[in-house]
Structures are given as C-alpha cells and as structure tokens.
From Swiss-Prot:
The lineage of its organism: Bacteria, Bacillati, Bacillota, Bacilli, Bacillales. The keyword Coiled coil does not apply. Transmembrane segments: none annotated. InterPro entries: Ribosomal_bL32, Ribosomal_bL32_bact, Ribosomal_zn-bd. It comes from Listeria welshimeri serovar 6b (strain ATCC 35897 / DSM 20650 / CCUG 15529 / CIP 8149 / NCTC 11857 / SLCC 5334 / V8). This is Large ribosomal subunit protein bL32B.
C-alpha cells in the first residue's frame, strides 16, 4: 500500500480542514409571536406555521 512521501504540514492539514466544522441551524423569527424557530418547522411557542395554527400551544 502507498505511503505519503513527506509528512503533511500543520498548515496544509488545517487548510484542508477549514470546511470541516459545525453549522448553526437556520433560525427565523416567527411572524406571529416574534420568537425564534427553526426554518420550515412549527413555532414551539405559539404552534403556528405559515399563518395557520397547526399545534395546540
């Protein structure tokens, strides 16, 4: 099996890993109550989605 000829430097390794990170969830403000909620999800505070009540709060 092939083995790297030279050791990978810290800079090269870190440049390669710049995209390996955690992403923050997409949060939007609820149009009804103003609380933050996940995009495309029912608001946990007021139970509304797309201007309609879909869950009991």
């Amino acid at each position: 099996m092939a083995v790297p000829f030279r050791r990978t430097s810290k800079a090269k390794k870190r440049k390669r890993r710049t995209h390996v990170k955690l992403q923050l969830p997409g949060m939007n403000e609820c149009s009804n109550c103003g609380e933050y909620r996940l995009s495309h999800h029912v608001c946990p505070e007021c139970g509304q989605y797309d201007g309609k009540e879909v869950a009991n709060s």
